[in-house]
A protein has these predicted regions:
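Secreted/periplasmic proteins
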Residues: 1-89
């Protein structure tokens, strides 16, 4: 399950948070890892770069920036079932 977020000044990697960038938070993947996130409800995908830590809510595997959430059309629901594929690091 993925969620999205839009608040914050600085990410755990030290980068300034940009809600429109194609970025995400993951608990264990190294910063800079590129991940294809696919919304299982509609098949839409986005490639994001991991630059933060989280999510810290049980059952969620990734937190997307607002911009990335918009690409896979999950902002209305707030959360969506997703699949993750590491595509680069």
């Amino acid at each position: 399950m993925a969620s999205y977020y839009w608040q914050g000044q600085q990410t755990a990697s030290g980068a300034r948070f940009n809600p429109n960038a194609m970025t995400a938070a993951h608990r264990t993947l190294p910063f800079g890892t590129k991940v294809r996130v696919t919304n299982k409800r509609n098949g839409r995908s986005v490639i994001v770069t991991i630059n933060d830590r989280g999510p810290f809510i049980r059952g969620r595997v990734i937190d997307l920036s607002s911009g990335a959430a918009g690409v896979i059309d999950m902002k209305g629901a707030g959360v969506a079932p997703v699949s993750l594929e590491v595509v680069g690091g």
